[in-house]
Amino acid sequence: MAVIVLAAGAGTRMKSTTQKTLHSIGGRTLLSHSLHAAAGIDPARIVAVIGHGREQVGPAVAEVAEQLGRSIDTAIQEQQNGTGHAVQCAMEQLEGFEGTVVVTNADVPLLSPETLQELTATHDGASVTVLSVNQDNPTGYGRILRTNDGMVTAIVEEKDATEKQKEITEVNSGVFAFDAAILRDGLAQLNTDNAQGELYLTDVLSIARRAGHPVRAHIASDAAELAGVNDRVQLAAAGAELNRRTVTAAMRGGATIVDPATTWIDVDVQVGQDVTILPGTQLLGTTTIGDNAQIGPDTTLENVKVGEGAQVVRTHGFDSTIGPRAEVGPFTYIRPGTVLGEEGKLGGFVEAKKANIGRGSKVPHLTYVGDATIGEYSNIGASSVFVNYDGVNKHHTTVGSHVRTGSDSMFIAPVVVGDGAYSGAGTVIKEDVPPGALVVSGGKQRNVEGWVAKKRPGTPAAEAGEAAAKRVAEGGSPTSTPQADQE
């Protein structure tokens, strides 16, 4: 079996500098969806016909072929002269091929391998089999013409149809299965005697019928699979339908999705059992979610591996790893190359980039960790910064295990903090810290008495300070603020 995927059209209704089939839904381009479907029936050959934007589409075909681990040939349609001409170009790549040739389109992203398999099963023994679908509104589609006993005789395009024929609701999906020899013979007889002046692939069906060859139609059970994408409105509709199917599959696989309407999951995402996904979550790319994890609300993860039992709240992360039973968020930004270990924590308003954070270590609040390695069971105080950039190069910081650093610590890379070390609040760490040491960088605090009254006279601060000084002189409190009891 061979599959031809037609991807040469201009797609002018997309109004885009990007070729139509390279627009994406569900984490794949339209082209990628169609090539994955083609590969899903395990054909001996796949040929993609490219034309408009081929400098973009050609490399995209090669990329998908690499992802699939198989070869995909390309045929170039220099001038777009109809679907029949496109298939003629493809058949030049299939010289000498015998068997079934399936023809499909790169702008039908929901078409599944299962439907293609049903088509080829119906086709067994026929010369041509068209995949048809019943449409409530068939406007714009080619109509399937049948005899009184139900035999398919022809497909008539909308522009060539009579008013009576336009009332037919069974339409051509643009997907066919052909006997290779019948296809070659039919392509050789095509002409442009039609309203559009093009070579219609659908005319091969009529040619085969007139020659006495059996022609069949397989009516698709799921019309939504065959919805084409020609503009941005249809792109959005196809994306929404694909997402509905993906989200439904995740729920049937054992995940709880609290609000499917606000949850978006790409087709290559893997979601484990007993996962809970809260509203406003996007799982993109090749993200994987381990069993019993909780994701969201308002979380976007792209190419992130999340371990079992992890909790990720109001977080944006990509190209990173979150370990089992780790806690992330809220309002956390995880950048590429970050690995958060088992039972680790990245808390509120923490940003991590190329950070390897060991098992049980915590970065709870308001901290930037960049180009760093942190060992096991360490705690980084609030408002700390790993200062990794000298204006030209990035440098690495290493923090050992069981380290405790005070709030507002600055790690001036490159620097190493040994196991078990402590730092005082506000410490600027410029040099390596020995294991078990306490590092402090500030000198003795100096209070300049009366500075505010002298330098800011007449201000509310000066007046408050003078009043408090009188209270202190009389044995009272230095502050009007009630002081909490100290335990």
Curated annotation (Swiss-Prot):
Residues 477-487 have a biased composition (Polar residues). InterPro entries: Bifunctional_GlmU (IPR005882), GlmU-like (IPR050065), GlmU_C_LbH (IPR038009), Hexapep (IPR001451), MobA-like_NTP_Trfase (IPR025877), Nucleotide-diphossugar_trans (IPR029044), Trimer_LpxA-like_sf (IPR011004). Acetyl-CoA binds at residues 382, 388-389, 407, 425. The keyword Magnesium applies. Its cofactor is Mg(2+). Residues 233-253 are annotated as: Linker. PANTHER family: BIFUNCTIONAL PROTEIN GLMU, NUCLEOTIDYL TRANSFERASE. This is Bifunctional protein GlmU. UDP-N-acetyl-alpha-D-glucosamine binds at residues 6-9, 20, 77, 82-83, 142, 157, 172, 230, 335, 353, 368, 379. Mg(2+) binds at residues 107, 230. Pathway: Nucleotide-sugar biosynthesis; UDP-N-acetyl-alpha-D-glucosamine biosynthesis; N-acetyl-alpha-D-glucosamine 1-phosphate from alpha-D-glucosamine 6-phosphate (route II): step 2/2; Nucleotide-sugar biosynthesis; UDP-N-acetyl-alpha-D-glucosamine biosynthesis; UDP-N-acetyl-alpha-D-glucosamine from N-acetyl-alpha-D-glucosamine 1-phosphate: step 1/1; Bacterial outer membrane biogenesis; LPS lipid A biosynthesis. CDD domains: GT2_GlmU_N_bac, LbH_GlmU_C. The lineage of its organism: Bacteria, Bacillati, Actinomycetota, Actinomycetes, Mycobacteriales. It is found in: Cytoplasm. GO terms for molecular function: glucosamine-1-phosphate N-acetyltransferase activity; magnesium ion binding; UDP-N-acetylglucosamine diphosphorylase activity. GO terms for biological process: cell morphogenesis; cell wall organization; lipid A biosynthetic process; peptidoglycan biosynthetic process; regulation of cell shape; UDP-N-acetylglucosamine biosynthetic process. Catalyzes the last two sequential reactions in the de novo biosynthetic pathway for UDP-N-acetylglucosamine (UDP-GlcNAc). The C-terminal domain catalyzes the transfer of acetyl group from acetyl coenzyme A to glucosamine-1-phosphate (GlcN-1-P) to produce N-acetylglucosamine-1-phosphate (GlcNAc-1-P), which is converted into UDP-GlcNAc by the transfer of uridine 5-monophosphate (from uridine 5-triphosphate), a reaction catalyzed by the N-terminal domain. SUPFAM superfamilies: Nucleotide-diphospho-sugar transferases, Trimeric LpxA-like enzymes. In the N-terminal section; belongs to the N-acetylglucosamine-1-phosphate uridyltransferase family. In the C-terminal section; belongs to the transferase hexapeptide repeat family. The keyword Repeat applies. Binds 1 Mg(2+) ion per subunit.
